[in-house]
Amino acid sequence: MKRIFRLVRRCHYSTEKRTNGPLVLVSNNQNIHFNLSLENFLLNNYNDLLKYLNINTIEKFNEPILFLWRNNRSIIIGKNQNIWSECNLKNIKEDGVLVARRFTGGGAVYHDLGNVCFTFLNNNINTSSNFLIILNTLKNHFNIEAKTQGRNDITVNDQKCSGSAFKKIKDVFLHHGTILINLEKNILNKYLTPDKIKYIKHGVSSVNARTINLSEINNNITCENLCIALIKEFTKFYEQNYKENINNIKNLENNINNSNFQNKEQININNTNENNLINNTNIIPNDITVHYIDQNNNITKNPEFLKYYNLLKDWDWCYGKTPKFQNHIWKQFTFGKLELFFNVSNGFIKDGNIFSDCLDINLIDHLKSIFNNDIKYSKEDISIFFKKLNVENKNYLDEVRSWILQEL
């Protein structure tokens, strides 16, 4: 893509600027570790976000956020996945593809400059509203009839064009995902080696067969005009409270290509690709609250951001150690695959781990507690352990309990 998406402006910080209302944030960096760190920082500092954006206010923030970003070639795996079985690490290393383990659940995905990443943040569970914004974007601006499928996918003609994952911290909800525009689908199988059992039930043989680029449906769609459309629909969705945004957002297309921004390296991030999704511009009207963030922003100098960034780059976090365990069981459930490794020492369950692409990371975290609570390797004690677990998805827990007890 040769065109440069110039969407955001420098914010002029003053008490006169409107500080309430939905925010649109865009990352001017294409490094996966940078963007995941930024996303996690926004999630954990949601209520204090205005001060980190240098807006002169004492208000606590509690409005919807749309965060748009894009990455160079990267493999991103779910928090609880086994990277050794999900990825072809030899090919990944040879081609210089970055690998990251995100902070949310779900499966392994491939990113490049042919897809747009979105993040919705809110203090309410608004997944249905978020999906509606995306569906309206595709229908109203590109004449693409898409639909939700399951809990986390958007499909066109029964092929997946978007996948999502979710996370909650305190009273803040995160919904993030990707939208495939012109992804290099032909190399998905080069880097990803997902369990074939996922595709047997779909009657297909590869990741490629299940996914579709939106450019295959409408060849006029690009990452840049999709983002403009998303901002329009996001603002339109909340127009009852913020009508002034709609009156001014029409100026976006006319002013997109007016200026450039030259990035400067600050924290040793390789972001030299010229095909930037966004560049700084001063042309968006002041009453549209859009902020750009790059590696020169104050947020990226914050110790908490740097902690996330260094963690994501850490080998132990990303790859982890998968020792040879005495016991290995796995099963594909409707909510995801579970793979358990554990040792039994002196009749007790020890030294284990659970790998999963399940979106409910709280369920997996609770299940992992079996490895550090001196649980006897017996049906009775394991059954008692499961009864004490306090999780939201009781049905999922019952399925896992029945399976493990059957495997003993």
From Swiss-Prot:
Pathway: Protein modification; protein lipoylation via exogenous pathway; protein N(6)-(lipoyl)lysine from lipoate: step 1/2; Protein modification; protein lipoylation via exogenous pathway; protein N(6)-(lipoyl)lysine from lipoate: step 2/2. CDD domains: LplA (cd16443). Its EC number is 6.3.1.20. Pfam families: Lip_prot_lig_C (PF10437), LplA-B_cat (PF21948). Mg(2+) binds at D153. Its main location: mitochondrion. Keywords: ATP-binding, Ligase, Magnesium, Metal-binding, Mitochondrion, Nucleotide-binding, Transit peptide. It is found in: Mitochondrion. It comes from the Eukaryota. GO terms for molecular function: ATP binding; lipoate-protein ligase activity; lipoyltransferase activity; metal ion binding. ATP binds at R102, G107, Y110, K160. GO terms for cellular component: cytoplasm; mitochondrion. It catalyses: L-lysyl-[lipoyl-carrier protein] + (R)-lipoate + ATP = N(6)-[(R)-lipoyl]-L-lysyl-[lipoyl-carrier protein] + AMP + diphosphate + H(+); (R)-dihydrolipoate + L-lysyl-[lipoyl-carrier protein] + ATP = N(6)-[(R)-dihydrolipoyl]-L-lysyl-[lipoyl-carrier protein] + AMP + diphosphate + H(+); (R)-dihydrolipoate + ATP + H(+) = N(6)-[(R)-dihydrolipoyl]-5'-AMP + diphosphate; N(6)-[(R)-dihydrolipoyl]-5'-AMP + L-lysyl-[lipoyl-carrier protein] = N(6)-[(R)-dihydrolipoyl]-L-lysyl-[lipoyl-carrier protein] + AMP + 2 H(+). Residues 1-18 form a transit peptide. (R)-lipoate binds at G107, K160. One of its GO terms (biological process) is lipid metabolic process. Residues 60-242 form the BPL/LPL catalytic domain. Inhibited by the lipoate analog 8-bromo-octanoate (BrO). Catalytic activity is increased in the presence of Mg(2+). Catalyzes both the ATP-dependent activation of exogenously supplied lipoate to lipoyl-AMP and the transfer of the activated lipoyl onto the lipoyl domains of lipoate-dependent enzymes. In the mitochondrion, functions as a redox switch between two lipoylation routes. Senses the oxidation state of lipoate and determines which downstream enzymes will be lipoylated. In low reducing conditions, uses lipoate in its oxidized ring form to lipoylate glycine cleavage system H-protein GCVH. PANTHER family: LIPOATE-PROTEIN LIGASE, LIPOYLTRANSFERASE 1, MITOCHONDRIAL. Belongs to the LplA family. This is Lipoate--protein ligase 1. It comes from Plasmodium falciparum (isolate 3D7).
